Amino acid sequence: TYASAQHIVRNSYYSAYGMTTDFTGVLGAQYIYHFDKCLFMPADLTGGIEFNHDNLHDKATDVQKYRDAALAEDPTATGDRLQQLIEKYTPAPLNQVVNIASVYAQNEWKNEQWSFLIGGRVDKNSIMDKAVFSPRANIRYNPTQDVNIRFSYAEGFRAPQAFDEDLHISNVGGELVSIVRAEGLKEERSRSFNASVDWYHYFGDFQANLLVE
């Protein structure tokens, strides 16, 4: 089992970053079991569960910057008109709470010449309607002690959520940008294929390596 937590409070750098608080916590458990023989060769079975919590709040605080922008649009603005323009240029506060529950498992068969890995992970993000399944597979073959041939496939995803690092990049450059997560966004998906041949060889005290990928 494992657990970690982090709480960030940011209110610095000449008000460019506004006021940001971000609490993240992780709680999980992992189990590993070794088979002397599973079907056709030794294997390691790994399984686990994990829960991630992220609570992000962000509020712009540089009122003078937004007042200057308002007066640049209408130098004669006063009273309610000026306040309306200031509100127009002030980025909307961001309040985002994300909970992610995950379960994963993989089994790796291996000996000195071969290894076969197959596994998968299911993640349920609270800002998404459905859980996402991400599979992975890997095959390794060593025809000789110096040569390693590997083929792998993996899938991944990224949920449509805002991150602390994205909030104030434009503001630091002088642009007034409000980050808002649009409704109905779907997750980004990735599929990765990889094939490689890795060669190692010792020449006395020196080691040579050639990788084709």
Regions flagged by a language model, labelled:
Residues 126, 146-193:
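Surface-exposed extracellular loop regions of Gram-negative outer-membrane beta-barrel proteins
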Residues 21-23, 41, 97-99, 131, ...:
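Residue-level preference for beta-strand/loop junctions
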Residues 1-11, 142, 150, 184-213:
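Membrane-embedded beta-barrel scaffold of Gram-negative outer-membrane proteins
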Residues 28-32, 102-108, 136-138, 152, ...:
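Outer-membrane beta-barrel architecture
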